[in-house]
Amino acid sequence: MEVVPAEVNSLLPDDIMDTAITLVDEDSIEAVIVSSPIPMETELEEIVNINSTGDSTATPISTEPITVYSNHTNQVAVNTTVSKADSNTTVKPAFPSGLQKLGAQTPVTISANQIILNKVSQTSDLKLGNQTLKPDGQKLILTTLGKSGSPIVLALPHSQLPQAQKVTAQAQPGDAKLPPQQIKVVTIGGRPEVKPVIGVSALTPGSQLINTTTQPSVLQTQQLKTVQIAKKPRTPTSGPVITKLIFAKPINSKAVTGQTTQASPPVVTGRVLSQSTPGTPSKTITISESGVIGSTLNSTTQTPNKIAISPLKSPNKTVKSAVQTITVGGMSTSQFKTIIPLATAPNVQQIQVPGSKFHYVRLVTATTASSSAQPVSQSPSVNTQPLQQAKPVVVNTTPVRMSVPFVQAQAVKQVVPKPINSTSQIVTTSQPQQRLIMPATPLPQIQPNLTNLPPGTVLAPAPGTGNVGYAVLPAQYVTQLQQSSYVSIASNSNFTGTSGIQTQARLPFNGIIPSESTSRPRKPCNCTKSLCLKLYCDCFANGEFCNNCNCTNCYNNLEHENERQKAIKACLDRNPEAFKPKIGKGKEGESDRRHSKGCNCKRSGCLKNYCECYEAKIMCSSICKCIGCKNFEESPERKTLMHLADAAEVRVQQQTAAKTKLSSQISDLLTRPTPALNSAGGKLPFTFVTKEVAEATCNCLLAQAEQADKKGKSKAAAERMILEEFGRCLMSVINSAGKAKSDPCAMHC
């Protein structure tokens, strides 16, 4: 037997001294025998109260063993004392842990006062009535079931609970404001015929036991063998509240929302949405049906500058200023703006009437021009017709509506709108003829033809534009197209806005036609770490995209155009002539090509592809800074290497042509139908080998194999017989073909 430590005895009441811990087996526990019936609810005499401030009343006590065991691996037996005072005696032990009140315990008389307690898992909760008993820690509250007794609080350490063989009784000073102590809920029972106890004490955050006096304990049995506190499933006191929101589709709602991007169907052109007297602001209400839940309906109040005016003859004053812009493309902010042409062929004029605070916009439509429009960013198409009277028409773009009048005009004056960004490019002319304003869509730009440009010229757009772009062209191209920042307008009537870019014919330079120079395949690059965005990448330096190269992690393609443009700009900032061809014409009057800056070879003798002159198959000139150069006309090494290089190139071309011809012939044989007749009109021999002939031949071969097996021939003899039979079959096929060739009529009969 193991003795309880001294700190345990010091925390227990003074009248309890004989306490020990004994490890017993579960098989040694005897059944609990109830000697007397349990009294009913009406037979309860009193409620035992425990007051923390009162003193304990000493009564004659006797020591009785109480066996406590757990469902876990270890079993603990505690010998404690049970007072045998009368039922009227009030026991008030002083507990510093803040226990103020103990619930009414049901008096149960058990022989030998043996009580079996089962420990509940930490995840279980016990709820009775409105009280919820939640285990928060490892503290055990044990009470005897006599008519009067002293409860014992056993606090088990967290780290030693599964392996503990000692019970430490701990009593801590209580404080009402401290967080709730960790209490371990225990159950009494574990035997068959379990009867639950209805009235159970609950713990408050102040570590107090409050009696559930509203519903006293009631036992519905006459005989009790084991008492167990029923384990209830955990019921949270406060759960999530589910709110169901039903959104109904608005039908006739006219709610006004200030800052909401509306999505409405296109408004029919020419529809009068407001009727008001002049001088008062008109209010246009557009009701749109949307399938998206939560969409709102906007009511747009038009400002007085959208009042329709009467037809004007000719404006008194034309102000050259920026045209009113509206947002497009579904943008909720107004930072992206562009000019929206309302029709294909109007001229926009902003009119300022002297002495008037209103701003008017007049659109003059041509009589013979078509009225199809192409707004920017996939706006709804608007078809406009010249109107005799000025009527407000709402042109529906996605976020903004603008009402403008259409009037007939007799005189036309030049108006040049200020472009907002690089995509809005509109220029008008001063000729009093039909005007055609190009829509601000990314159409192919009409670019002029520029001649007499050196090959490899780097082109930049006109200064003043926001976006700076570079067009790097290979050295073999002669035509250099300059990007213009405007769109020219044709004065004739048969002008089409979809004309392509015009290019000039390629001219021979340095005695070599571009088609001849491009016939030579470009050497693939082998870049690994430069992303093909450095000048030592031949593809990047020549202004070409990588194609069929051996590079890794390549950015020199259309998928990484932004990074490529940044690298080009960085190279041009360091050297404006970085992308110009290094092999160009010599001085005037010279037809030979020469290096523009010269090579700087030191150890290769200018006879390897490291030398740019040798790679271009030109000789080094006086401007080269090479050392030990052998790349001159009289050099035998150069002649030998050049001949070898030419021979190797010719051999590669021949091999490529042979492979191409062979593959084409094979594909031709596979796709070409098999001719059944020869040139003389006879049937070819292989056409006699049909499916039936093949099956008959196989049967003959199998028959020879079976015959050789029956005769007990050796393997070699059997193979000889099969081959001889196969030869006879082939000879019969050939003889049949010969007979058919000699007698053509037999083939047709």
Swiss-Prot record:
InterPro entries: CRC (IPR005172), Lin-54_fam (IPR028307), Tesmin/TSO1-like_CXC (IPR033467). The modification Phosphoserine is found at residues 264, 282, 310, 314, 635. Zn(2+) 6 binds at residues 606, 620, 626, 629. Residues 583-596 are annotated as: Linker. GO terms for biological process: nucleosome organization. The record marks 574 as: Interaction with DNA. Zn(2+) 1 binds at residues 525, 527, 532, 537. Residues 521-634 form the CRC domain. The modification N6-acetyllysine is found at residues 244, 249. One of its GO terms (cellular component) is RNA polymerase II transcription repressor complex. Disulfide bonds: none annotated. Zn(2+) 5 binds at residues 599, 613, 620, 624. This is Protein lin-54 homolog.
